[in-house]
Amino acid sequence: MDPWIALSSPLTSQTVEYVANTLRIMCAISWNISYMSMAYYSFRDKTYGNALIPLCNNIAWEFVYSFIHCPKLTFVRIENTGWFLLNIVVMYAAIKYSENEWKHAPLVQRNLPFIFAVGISAMIAGHLALAAQIGPRIAFVWSAKGCQLVLSTGALSQLLSRGSTRGGSYVVWLSRYLGTVFIDVMVTIRHVYRAAGPSWPSSPLLLWFMAVFHLLDWTYGFCFYHIRRQELVSEAAEKDKDK
């Protein structure tokens, strides 16, 4: 079943249609807040807030579905293009401040622009291959869920490997989490309140994506809280020493 039918088909009532459209707008707002906050904290902390592989993957997905396989829905096109531009800013921060994060790996430190070029090109090829395999409109949805899991996994891995919250914040995490929750609820509503609901929203694979996403992002929030609390304790101890 083509997921775009579920995303754009009329629903059983105007009230349900209003709720679904509101959730879609809230998703866009939440992700915009997350990306803008990520860019802000990247420059403030002189680092980057998105791990390299998820960043390459997101930029590639947004490029493919903004400029190659453009969705017919104007709102979605604008949304994807905005996210693409914001992620370019985050990538610039990663290149600019790479020396702060990759002192232990000079090969990466010196070649980050090349790594981004190869990584984004490879991811674009992968998204185009999936679109050619199953069709761009279906690939749009499934690859987006894949991007979400890669992003959540990368964010958690980066937080744990750094042992620091630099480049991140509760705003970045919570707006990212809520953005995905809003779109999942919207899709569920469109599935339930459409007379001939498609099979994909209730598929085992989609349910697996949702379950793993919640596990990863709540784990991230839990770890972020404990690491940030320890940072505040250390900062307070340093201030006491200076007195």
UniProtKB/Swiss-Prot annotation:
EC number: 5.4.99.-
Subcellular localization: Membrane
UniProt pathway: Secondary metabolite biosynthesis; terpenoid biosynthesis
GO biological-process terms attached to the record: novofumigatonin biosynthetic process
Pfam family, one: Pyr4-TMTC
Catalytic activity: (3R)-[(10S)-11-epoxyfarnesyl]-2,3,5-trimethyl-6-oxido-4-oxocyclohexa-1,5-diene-1-carboxylate + H(+) = asnovolin H
Bilayer disposition of the protein: Multi-pass membrane protein
InterPro entries per UniProt: PaxB-like (IPR039020)
GO cellular component: membrane
GO molecular function: isomerase activity; terpene synthase activity
Effect of disrupting the coding gene: Completely abolishes the production of novofumigatonin and asnovolin A.
Record carries keyword Membrane: yes
EC top class named in words: isomerase
Residue ranges of the TM segments: 20-42, 51-71, 75-95, 112-132, 138-160, 169-189, 205-225
Keywords linked to the UniProt accession: Isomerase, Membrane, Transmembrane, Transmembrane helix
Similarity annotation: Belongs to the paxB family.
Annotated function: Terpene cyclase; part of the gene cluster that mediates the biosynthesis of novofumigatonin, a heavily oxygenated meroterpenoid containing a unique orthoester moiety. The first step of the pathway is the synthesis of 3,5-dimethylorsellinic acid (DMOA) by the polyketide synthase nvfA via condensation of one acetyl-CoA starter unit with 3 malonyl-CoA units and 2 methylations. DMOA is then converted to farnesyl-DMOA by the farnesyltransferase nvfB.
Name the record gives this protein: Asnovolin H synthase nvfL
Organism: Aspergillus novofumigatus (strain IBT 16806)
Gene expressing this chain: nvfL
